Amino acid sequence: MKLTCLMIVAVLFLTAWTFVTAVPDSSNALENLYLKAHHEMNNPEDSELNKRCYDGGTSCNTGNQCCSGWCIFLCL
């Protein structure tokens, strides 16, 4: 019985400690995510989802065009 109570107290303490030591800005995490999504809807050209790159075996000019980042006349 004592061991069970001790385990419950330990779990509650560790749970509380996790919340206390969490990232200070975590309370605004959803708000920041919403603002970022709203910005991407207003400026679709700036969205990271619109990033286009070439798959391996496709001809390329620079490494920036390849999804892997490696270009030697063909994306690697």
Swiss-Prot record:
<keyword id="KW-0528">Neurotoxin</keyword>
<keyword id="KW-0638">Presynaptic neurotoxin</keyword>
<dbReference type="GO" id="GO:0044231">
    <property type="term" value="C:host cell presynaptic membrane"/>
</dbReference>
<feature type="disulfide bond">
    <location>
        <begin position="60"/>
        <end position="71"/>
    </location>
</feature>
<dbReference type="GO" id="GO:0090729">
    <property type="term" value="F:toxin activity"/>
</dbReference>
<keyword id="KW-0732">Signal</keyword>
<feature type="signal peptide">
    <location>
        <begin position="1"/>
        <end position="22"/>
    </location>
</feature>
<feature type="disulfide bond">
    <location>
        <begin position="66"/>
        <end position="75"/>
    </location>
</feature>
<dbReference type="Pfam" id="PF02950">
    <property type="entry name" value="Conotoxin"/>
</dbReference>
<keyword id="KW-0964">Secreted</keyword>
<keyword id="KW-0165">Cleavage on pair of basic residues</keyword>
<keyword id="KW-0872">Ion channel impairing toxin</keyword>
<dbReference type="GO" id="GO:0005576">
    <property type="term" value="C:extracellular region"/>
</dbReference>
<keyword id="KW-0800">Toxin</keyword>
<feature type="disulfide bond">
    <location>
        <begin position="53"/>
        <end position="67"/>
    </location>
</feature>
<comment type="function">
    <text>Omega-conotoxins act at presynaptic membranes, they bind and block voltage-gated calcium channels (Cav).</text>
</comment>
<keyword id="KW-0960">Knottin</keyword>
<keyword id="KW-0108">Calcium channel impairing toxin</keyword>
<keyword id="KW-1218">Voltage-gated calcium channel impairing toxin</keyword>
<keyword id="KW-1015">Disulfide bond</keyword>
<comment type="similarity">
    <text>Belongs to the conotoxin O1 superfamily.</text>
</comment>
<dbReference type="InterPro" id="IPR004214">
    <property type="entry name" value="Conotoxin"/>
</dbReference>
<dbReference type="GO" id="GO:0005246">
    <property type="term" value="F:calcium channel regulator activity"/>
</dbReference>
<dbReference type="GO" id="GO:0008200">
    <property type="term" value="F:ion channel inhibitor activity"/>
</dbReference>
<protein>
    <recommendedName>
        <fullName>Omega-conotoxin-like Ai6.3</fullName>
    </recommendedName>
</protein>
<feature type="propeptide">
    <location>
        <begin position="23"/>
        <end position="50"/>
    </location>
</feature>
